[in-house]
Amino acid sequence: MPTVPMTPAPSPESRIRIIALGDELLAGVGDARALGWLGRAVASEQGADSRIDVFASALPGESSAALADRWDAEVQARMSTQGQADGSIDHRVVLALGRADVEAGISLARSRLNLAKILDGLERLRIPAFVVGPPPSRDPGTTAGVRELSGAFEDVCSRRRIPYVDTVGGLSGHEQWESDLSRSPRDHPGQTGYGLMAWLVLHGGFGSWLGTSS
């Protein structure tokens, strides 16, 4: 299990507000249960007090460049300045990065800069980030590009001690993942695939980052 950088734990009295930004997989497209990996991961960490609130914004086919352009406005619109000031709301941002950079031909250097811009901006806002990388495609050529992209994203996060989940590394060659994709007309996972992604996220330190589990 990877070591998750220490993130200040929220006060037991505060609510946890997750602001999640990403592409269509963040929204659980193709999931018959309409939960996606995020819904499953949060449900696993949600206690009886239901103190975790999720405010998600997903854009189909979003590249890192598009995310770098919109993240600030999206986060600011979902923040509670009063809650941040009085400590009643603990804000956290989840970034769900997709494969669009590979498909759009964006260079690795540019992809790195785009993610760095977002993470450095969140640091200035003093909001902890958790990054989930793009999963494999059923197309081997695309998956090869995603592996390189994910490695670049992981390096950016590592330099900033921000947790990163390498889903392409965890799911490439996984029989259940590949079977799930083979049934999809749009190269999206179904219930099984999203469950596998959620498992990787949970075992990538999601609960420790939230402060809801060790």
Across the structure, where does each feature detected by a protein language model lie?
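Serine-esterase "nucleophile elbow" of acetyl-processing enzymes
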Residues: 1-60, 65, 70-80, 84-85
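Catalytic His-Asp segment of secreted/periplasmic serine-dependent ester chemistry enzymes
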Residues: 2, 136-214
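Structural motif
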Residues: 17, 91-94, 128
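Short, solvent-exposed loop/turn segments at secondary-structure boundaries
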Residues: 29-33, 105-109, 140-145
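Cell-envelope and extracellular/periplasmic
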Residues: 57-62, 95-102
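Glycine-rich phosphate-binding loop signature in dinucleotide/nucleotide-binding domains
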Residues: 77-90, 125-126, 208-210
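Active-site segments of SGNH/GDSL-like serine hydrolases
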Residues: 96-100, 118-148
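Charged helix-capping and loop-helix junction motifs
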Residues: 108-117, 145-151
